[in-house]
Amino acid sequence: IVPVNPLVAREGGQILGEAAYASVTDAAAALAAQGQKIDMVDCFRKSEDIPPLADEAVAIGAQCLWLQLGVFNEAAGLRAEAAGLQVIQNRCVKIEHARLFGGLGWMGVNTRVISAKRLRQLPY
């Protein structure tokens, strides 16, 4: 996981101990110098901010463009798909991982229907 945040990067800062980059392109270049590449671009941005990020994801050769809950941009998604990227919109990576591999119950989330509320009574 490589953080991209222009405001933090401008000050030479870090996020969770990792150097922050000003753009996806900058992050990809830094990783390429270490023999690594970005496979997935996971966007926590407003929907209207997605088109340039999708273009960067295509340009760096990412395999997947993932837009988090509440984030979707049909035009950018179609462009990325046309370039060969897998595009997921309006989904949370953590929730999907837990749904596929187990673990939703650890957070108090109903495993059949995702809800932020705990049940008032346990079903057993």
PLM region spans:
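A charged, well-structured terminal subsegment
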Residues: 96-124
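NAD(P)-binding Rossmann-fold cofactor-contacting core
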Residues: 1-13
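Glycine-rich, highly charged phosphate/nucleotide-binding loops
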Residues: 14-36, 42-51
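N-terminal Rossmann-like NAD(P) cofactor-binding module of classical short-chain dehydrogenase/reductase
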Residues: 41-42, 66
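Rossmann-fold NAD(P) dinucleotide-binding segment
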Residues: 49-68
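Rossmann-fold NAD(P)-binding glycine/threonine-rich loop
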Residues: 69-96, 103
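Local beta-strand N-terminus motif with an aromatic residue
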Residues: 37-38, 62
